[in-house]
Amino acid sequence: MTHTEQGAAQTPTITTVLVANRGEIARRVFTTARHRGLSTVAVYSDADQNEPFAREADAAVRLPGNAPGETYLNADAVLDAARRAGADAIHPGYGFLSENAGFARAVIDAGLVWIGPSPEAIDAMGSKTEAKKLMEAAGVPVLTNLDTAEITEEMLPVLVKASAGGGGRGMRVVRTLDELESETSAAVREAESAFGDGTVFIERYIESGRHIEVQLMADNHGGVWAVGERECSIQRRHQKVIEEAPSPLVERVDGMRDRLFEAARAAAHAIGYSGAGTVEFLANDKGEFFFLEVNTRLQVEHPVTEATTGLDLVGLQFDVAAGFHLPSENPPALDGWAVEARVYAEDPRHDYRPMSGEVLRFDFDDVVSSFTGPHVPGIRLDAGPETAPGRPAVVGVNYDAMLAKVISWAPTRAEAVGRLSGALRRARVHGLGTNRDQLVRILDDADFRAGDINTAFLESTHTEVSTVPLADDDTVSVSAFAAAVVAEADATSTRPTRHVRAGFRLFGDARTTHRYTVGQGSGDAENGVDVDVVRSSRSSGGESVTLGSDRNVRLVAVTPPDGVNRDTGTPATVILEVDGIRRTLTVHRYPGGGVGVDSALGPVMLTERPRYDDPSDIVAEGALVAPMPGTVTSVSVTVGDEVTTGQKLMTIEAMKMEHTISATTDGTVSSLAAATGDHIETGTLLAVIDSPDASDTDNQTDN
């Protein structure tokens, strides 16, 4: 039977697809489904009821609650939603139930089409320990598992890994024997939270390896494609940050691609694989590689493979599920280079602290498509949230911190990297903090540009790219001045017409002070900046200011001259002369005091603050407050304990990751305001540490 004849016979078996997921991956699957004329069904938690993916589907079914266990991990609720909405197929996306063999069986037993590999294949790869045994038997190179009781100092460092999961959750590097028990326990807790299975195993940790993976696509008739490789070596906390296709290492090492593809196909045949999957390897610079795992689902980074092959991998998943053969014996040849950057709501400068709150604006230039392409030079944007004037996107703490994937394609790696760097640098990302600055720093790094990368890139050899913002102190001051100029124009436009322009005096100069916090809200404040706007009646030069660095800034023009409406999202353009060089800055002002300033100097997010601080906002010395909302998962100290700077006090789980709260000073724990299981908000008092130095100072008297 020809492919066309098969299509006529099989396509009607899928008419309505439910996506058992959320965010950008749900929107991605809906895109292909619409292209194929299929109806779409979303499931959504209470926290997601207003998200774009829930609005875009033809039908949406509520999963009551917010926690993953009661919503997106609730197999019975998802199946009931499919029945109620009339879906005849389920696509699991990635994460949540995507690699749950029991769920796959339940879907099939319910008479629905499962758009994924067989439950048997998922089972075979569901336990990483058993998977390694299967791969070793199939001739695929593997790293051996270690017995906890037999680990010695000479074997360190080792890696604790969740057997049931991926994405860096339930994964801990152990560098001393003293940490082995506590880090293993932490990995177990993360694995139980993320995957419902706390099983972990331990293997040798290769410090400077390279993460290489092969995209598989297999049908139900024995056809297997190795659809190119990807390199995902740029990681933080064992989660990928930047991915690319092809791999710079594989391009450089003769014969490595053939060996990788052979190993990947052997892995697929060993478990009778069908559908989309990925075989992950850890490689060294010599081109040697070791099996890590098979991800029995679509990967987050699948767009770079689509961009370099022209394939629609989700469409192929539909075809395989409908019983089609792969359309040819071999996959398309690779064309050009693609790079993907993951934009996370997190602060890399503070141990990747997750950020929650409002995304006020999320705009990128040069976007040629969303969720498909690009197959011409340009940018593809796969984003979960969307913003509009007066309608910010809200990011909570219940789910993963990834906001979007930004993908570039170009004929060469240098062009693709440069295009992505430029798009990220120029993007208008306003509101809560993200890792955008870090992504640009990585892409512009000389070693990254040369392809000299490894999995330790961010954590050891290039830590500075995580801590240096794109905007330096001078740029912050210049941007704050531009914001103050617009604030003055806004104030003038709202005053009665009988008044002259604010700040004008017949003789002498007028000075107005504006205060800003860098970041959005006091919880994000890294520092504050005060700006004096000086208008002179004796000079045609207009407003000017001398910054602390002695750089002179003069206002040339502001458009519109009478201010902007915060609610419409209309920006103001401010032209400044900075040390004799003209600069154009775009200023967006938002309800609530947020101000986004974008220019070639670097992006700056500010928050307007009152001229005088409210005493109630001042945190007492020694008090530790929650840097993020979340749930307290463990408390390691009690009242009266002596602690030292950096000592672990408690852990908080937010966005499916654990975060350590440490002592900021030596002293005694005088108060504990949080207990295990407590749900907390940003700014919640957690503990108070009395410092000996502070006590000595308080007790001093005059002699």
Regions found by a protein language model. Give the residues of each.
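N-terminal beta-alpha lobe that positions the nucleotide/phosphoryl donor
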Residues: 1-279, 283-302
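Short amphipathic alpha-helical segments
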Residues: 169, 245, 400-406, 620-622
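Catalytic cores of soluble metabolic enzymes centered on carboxylation/carboxyl-transfer
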Residues: 303-306, 311-552, 645, 678-703
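Conserved nucleotide-binding/hydrolysis modules and their immediate coupling elements
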Residues: 538-542, 548-583
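Catalytic P-loop NTP-binding/switch module of NTPases
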Residues: 582, 586-626
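Structured functional modules or segments
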Residues: 615-703
